[in-house]
Amino acid sequence: MQIKNFGMVCVATFFSLSAGMAHATSGGEPAGPIGGSDVGSAYLPPPGLYGALVGLNLDGDKFKGDNQQVSQENPNSLFKITEGGAALLYVYPFQLAGGSLASSFFYGALHQHIRLGLPGGHNIFDSDTSGGADIYSDLLIWSRYVGHLGSYAPQGLHSAYPYPLPYGLTIAPALSLQFPTGSYHNNAAPSIGHNYYVFVPNISLTYLTPPITSWDEGVEVSTRFYYDISTQNHSQNYRSGDVLALDWAVADRVGLWKLGVAGSYAQQVSDDIAYNKPAYGTGNWFRMFAIGPVVYRDLPSINGFVKAKVTFEPVSRNGYPVTAVVLAIGKRF
């Protein structure tokens, strides 16, 4: 069964930003769309051009070091980012091997305030800057409905949508790329832009279960796996380590609403390399885990959607544990 009229219900996944992107590490960190992926990450809408506006606020302090504990060397640290971004998604008017094809584009501008503070109130640095972020693009996405795999809509189900929902499994492999277009200054620590490319092969899976109550239409379970491969920053003779990342969401579908929990996990899997040696003697490995509520609603009157997500970060290694607030609104042009 190929779902051909799945509308804006599945657009929001591509207009989200990963809280994991908000870490001021010198090296490995996850690259991805503004806010990360969450609900419906494997779905594509019908052919056409879609756009969205996304806002992000990140607030953290108490830099955690290599042992995942608050750094005693920098107890007065601070991390704040406010970002606004725009996203475009184009779904091509043809299919390949039974699946839809699309490309996306994300661009944001941000203000960041980052401080590393020594005991006694002295600062290593206190950076307060604004500028454009690196461009992120899903160069090509291929989304295909695989099958029911045990999940069927019950007879007589009353749905808020005039078309069938894709009960079962949908997959969406993609090839993505982060471009070094952001504001970069070699002596800024850290700079907003990264001055290197990040290649991001990834795959999304979304499974919609049958309804579990008399008032819902099923539970939607989504995951998106990324493998981030960074090129070398030649101006600093530094290469960030590869990062394995996962965005996920579990949401109950209730009419035009999706209500659930979303999160991210990222783990660096190879050393940062500086001047042909492991950076800082340890490889500067990065890790993070974030979790929090997500709320999504379709807006049929404008053929659009609105979404809000808040995540908290109980696990952080070589980064700032942040509280992330993401707001997004989008529609079809």
Give the residues covered by each predicted segment.
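Residues that define the transmembrane beta-barrel architecture of outer-membrane proteins
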Residues: 47, 78-86, 128-137, 169, ...
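Transmembrane beta-barrel strands of outer-membrane/channel proteins
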Residues: 32-33, 51-59, 103-111, 171-179, ...
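Short loop/turn motifs that connect adjacent beta-strands in outer-membrane beta-barrel proteins
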Residues: 25-26, 40-48, 60, 93-102, ...
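Sequence/structural signature of outer-membrane beta-barrel proteins
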Residues: 60-62, 110-116, 146, 178-188, ...
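Residues on the lipid-exposed face of transmembrane beta-strands in outer-membrane beta-barrel proteins
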Residues: 39-41, 53, 86-92, 137-143, ...
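Surface-exposed strand-loop-strand hairpins of Gram-negative outer-membrane beta-barrel proteins
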Residues: 26-30, 58-83, 118-127, 190
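Outer membrane beta-barrel transmembrane domains
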Residues: 29, 64, 70-71, 232-333
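Long, hydrophobic/aromatic-enriched structural stretches that serve as scaffold segments
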Residues: 75-146, 171
